[in-house]
């Protein structure tokens, strides 16, 4: 099922495509994703992690990559949607962790993404019962909430995930009052330096440990430099870093369960199917939903001679006009 390049044959019509979800080993998944993605891809992921590749079965080509993981703690639109903050009680915290998952990587290969609305297909696949069952089996979950955020921030009035009801629904804008995370060797070097000086300062089993480590180091640095010219310079740097982040559009899926909020918040553990929408979340129905949209897209591009034929892999040697 593997191929030399993670691409799709751009000459095939959407009506002829068939897909398979494949859970790849981490090393293989990382290699493929780094070929097509411009962002920094994390290899060490705390908490739950499901790495998937989507295979187009006729051409035996990979058309996209997905990584699902444990959700972030702070999410204002989620709190508003659920009618409360899950961290307020141990019961709600346990229920949330048992039922919720977040999409961190939803990246189509190119030109599949452009020619066939590949991003919408991958996002919809994340909302499928088949994905939910994979998570339930792997982590003994009772999955009923999938969430993700838009690629672009609030400077964009729309997102690639708009127009995806009932699979994905827009639920509001995230808060943007946070500092971009440090990754890779700079982060590890800084953490090691501080731990060598004062010992381990965030428990090994703490949730969102990397964020807590980063915020604690910033707080200690501010305290140590308080009242000094260096402290003023550091505070200004932090303020500038805060201005780099934008509010993101937050999207959620309930997998076709009408009482998902009560289950996520621990008020009950019995899921109730929405008779109008539940079946729409089966993978076969999701693919057919996508196929109609992709057919319109593909045939329009063909008619206007705008089909992209070039395989896009991230080498740094040429300019790509799609951030992913």
Q: What are the residue ranges of the model-derived segments?
A:
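Extended, Lys/Arg-enriched charged tracts that mediate electrostatic binding to polyanionic substrates
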Residues: 19-41
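Short, small-residue-biased leader/transition segments that mark boundaries at the very start
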Residues: 2-5
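Long, compositionally biased intrinsically disordered regions
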Residues: 192-324
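Acyl-donor binding region in acyl/amide transferases
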Residues: 26, 30, 48-50, 56-200
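Short loop/turn motifs at secondary-structure junctions and domain boundaries
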Residues: 42-47
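Extended, well-ordered protein cores
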Residues: 10-15
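Generic detector of solvent-exposed, compositionally biased contiguous segments
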Residues: 16-18, 123
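General structural signal for secondary-structure boundaries
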Residues: 28, 35-37, 151, 182-187, ...
